[in-house]
Amino acid sequence: MHEVGPGDTVDVGVSVEAVPAWHDGRRRPGPGADELDALGYLVDGIWFAGDTDYDPAMEALRGRVDCALIPVWGWGPSLGPGHLDPAGAARVIDLIAPRIAVPIHWGTFLPLGLGRRHERLLTDPPLEFAAAVTGATEVTVVSPGGVVEL
């Protein structure tokens, strides 16, 4: 195990660079909770964004990312700061211009209290994301548990 912060790189058979993410860094709820830097990871041109929001500083990733694994939703009908919805995720992808983008963080969890009224949140976010990307990036939508060949 290696503790890392933004900008740190470790070699574990491949080079893993910790890159900033824009999300609440608390590790437990409530006042006095430990707060750490929220992170994403860049591994040989593949960027796992982690839980993040849009930030113009992401432009530093432009030209470094071949494949982006980008969150396009969360778990409910609205998302607060620190999260990307389909339009926000498309904005990030248009900013950094990877060759391929794979929408993640969707389709796996719908709290019981939301019921059938919000079932579209299990299926629509990656399609909305793909429609919102305006650049040349190829969007590959894969169902949860699926595989992407690079």
Spans of features found by a protein language model:
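Core dinuclear metal-dependent hydrolase active-site scaffold
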Residues: 3-63, 81, 131, 143-150
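A generic short-segment signal for beta-strand/edge and adjacent turn/coil regions
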Residues: 10-11, 41, 70-72, 108-112
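General N-terminal targeting signals
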Residues: 28, 33, 64-65, 85, ...
